[in-house]
Amino acid sequence: MGNIRTTFVKRTAKELLELHGDKFNSDFENNKQVVAEYSTVSTKHLRNQIAGYATHLLEQ
């Protein structure tokens, strides 16, 4: 069983995908850089959660 992602993580990832979807791909490392560049998240843990969820959405 995995961890449940918060609404903030899901909403932020979806918004970033809508605004900057062409910059994201199925590579987690690339998505971490994109999230760091285009969002104002304060912690590395939160950045990684958002990048992971964005990667998950793209792989579906």
From Swiss-Prot:
Any single Pfam family the record assigns to this protein: Ribosomal_S17e
Q: Which UniProt keywords apply?
A: Ribonucleoprotein, Ribosomal protein
A GO molecular function annotation here is: structural constituent of ribosome
Cross-referenced InterPro entries, in alphabetical order?
Answer: Ribosomal_eS17, Ribosomal_eS17_CS, Ribosomal_eS17_sf
Q: Which SUPFAM superfamilies match?
A: Rps17e-like
UniProt keyword Ribosomal protein, yes or no: yes
Single GO BP term: translation
- One Gene Ontology CC term in the entry: ribosome
UniProt xrefs under PROSITE patterns = RIBOSOMAL_S17E (PS00712)
The UniProt entry, under Gene3D superfamilies, shows: Ribosomal protein S17e-like
Enumerate the PANTHER family for this protein: 40S RIBOSOMAL PROTEIN S17
Q: In which family does this protein belong, per the annotation?
A: Belongs to the eukaryotic ribosomal protein eS17 family.
Name-wise, this protein is: Small ribosomal subunit protein eS17
Q: What is the lineage of its organism?
A: Archaea, Methanobacteriati, Methanobacteriota, Methanomada group, Methanobacteria
| Gene field | rps17e
